[in-house]
Regions:
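Terminal targeting signals and extreme-terminal segments of soluble enzymes
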Residues: 1-115
Length: 115
């Protein structure tokens, strides 16, 4: 686990700063062969729920940030989440590296759809 901001193997440190994400971070990113952007965060003690795993609000915040980052990659306009649906598959314990992948599936004049 890295609390120092040292990226895990294959990742680079974020070069952007946003108060909410800075509070959750440090965050990392990498690009896969298909140009897919992957964001990474380690689960820290302050991110835990009462059962010792990552709080659902943290997971949703990271997913939302990833979806927005994906939508803005090829746009010069800021984005805001209009609707968000999530399902949790399994707990993420302390020290886990959370990897978040998002892609834009459809773009309109004023809306982008991502998953």
């Amino acid at each position: 686990m890295s609390k120092t901001g040292i990226p895990p193997k294959g990742y680079k440190a974020f070069n952007i700063s946003q108060p909410h994400i800075d509070n959750l971070g440090p965050g990392f990113y990498k690009k896969e062969d298909d140009d897919q952007l992957v964001l990474g965060f380690f689960v820290k003690e302050e991110n835990l729920n009462g059962y010792g795993s990552a709080h659902g609000g943290l997971l949703m915040a990271l997913a939302d940030f990833s979806l927005a980052t994906s939508a803005m990659r090829n746009s010069d306009k800021p984005v805001t989440t209009v609707s968000f649906h999530s399902e949790f598959i399994r707990p993420a314990p302390l020290g886990s590296l959370l990897e978040v992948r998002a892609k834009v599936t459809k773009k309109g004049k004023s809306l982008a759809f991502s998953e």
